[in-house]
């Protein structure tokens, strides 16, 4: 993201504690930076230690610049190592975070199998790979939500954003486990929005198309595939991670205070609204 790029300001996000799973790279990292710019306290969970350190160093640089310009530094993201495929780690990290921070105002369930590893045809899927995709893409989403919602309820509300995909709505061939988990994400979002609504906890999802993260560009977005994507999209260009992250930030803010149970599509016009 260009340092000079103008970013909308959401006063309701100031001093809020935001937890982002898969927050060290791609859309998660873009979201972490945007929330830090809003003066939110950002907690990033990931297994990518080096990427997390690079993100922290980038925000430190932005913080110094912001302090020079405005007199106020940016909060520096805190990194927690967490392999979301391991439910015991999910539980222990959630407990540690609650002990250290008491309350998460905003939960971004972003961690997911990404890049080439998500592409397994039906005949190449094994019971182990099927279970792995469900642990990484869906199971942690449910159990982090389960762990953090009670404190949100006690505090009078909160916001949860689940990261989905349009893959189950287009003829996406060769990734049946992935598409199944992403369809389930919409179902979980709608179910939780009804269950948690009386507690003023909003639950929404963002459905991605092809997003030009560093990993996607390296492993998936070949010139031939990019040509196919652009042909399918209304916008004939790449969708950038920060463009997705801006929608996440809006949904997390009080500007979306009446929005819950919704799935926002950010796909350059590939399939449009659900």
Language-model features, listed with the residues they occupy:
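Short C-terminal tail/terminal secondary-structure segment
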Residues: 2-9, 114, 170, 249, ...
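Canonical Rossmann dinucleotide-binding motif of NAD(H)/NADP(H)-dependent dehydrogenases/reductases
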Residues: 8-43
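Substrate-binding pocket helix/loop in short-chain dehydrogenase/reductase
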Residues: 118-122, 126-134, 229
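C-terminal substrate-recognition "lid" of short-chain dehydrogenase/reductases
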Residues: 142, 157, 237-266, 271
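Active-site helix of classical SDR
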Residues: 145, 181, 189
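Alpha-helical segment proximal to the catalytic Tyr-Lys
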Residues: 150, 194-198, 257
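Residue(s) in the substrate-gating loop at a strand-loop-helix junction
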Residues: 165
């Amino acid at each position: 993201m260009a340092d000079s790029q103008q970013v909308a300001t959401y006063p309701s996000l100031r001093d809020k504690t935001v937890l982002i799973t898969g927050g060290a790279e791609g859309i998660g990292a873009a979201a972490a930076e945007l929330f830090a710019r809003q003066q939110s306290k950002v907690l990033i969970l990931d297994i990518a230690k080096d990427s997390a350190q690079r993100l922290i160093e980038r925000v430190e640089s932005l913080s110094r610049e912001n302090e020079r310009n405005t007199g106020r530094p940016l909060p520096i993201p805190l990194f927690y190592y967490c392999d979301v495929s391991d439910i015991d780690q999910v539980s222990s990290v959630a407990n540690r975070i609650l002990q250290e921070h008491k309350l998460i105002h905003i939960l971004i369930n972003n961690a997911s199998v990404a890049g080439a590893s998500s592409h397994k045809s039906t005949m190449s899927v094994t019971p182990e790979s099927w279970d792995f995709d469900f642990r990484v893409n869906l199971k942690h989403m449910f159990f982090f939500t389960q762990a953090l919602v009670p404190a949100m309820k006690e505090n009078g509300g909160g916001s949860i954003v689940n990261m989905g995909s349009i893959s189950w709505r287009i003829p996406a061939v060769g990734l049946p486990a992935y598409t199944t988990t992403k369809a389930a994400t919409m179902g979980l979002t709608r179910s939780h929005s009804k269950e948690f609504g009386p507690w003023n906890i909003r639950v929404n999802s963002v459905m991605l198309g092809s997003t030009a993260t560093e990993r996607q560009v390296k492993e998936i977005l070949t010139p031939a595939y990019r040509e196919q994507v652009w042909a399918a999209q209304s916008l004939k260009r790449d969708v950038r991670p920060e463009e997705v992250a801006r929608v996440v930030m809006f949904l997390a803010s009080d500007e979306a205070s009446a929005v819950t149970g919704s799935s926002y599509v950010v796909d350059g016009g590939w399939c449009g609204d659900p």
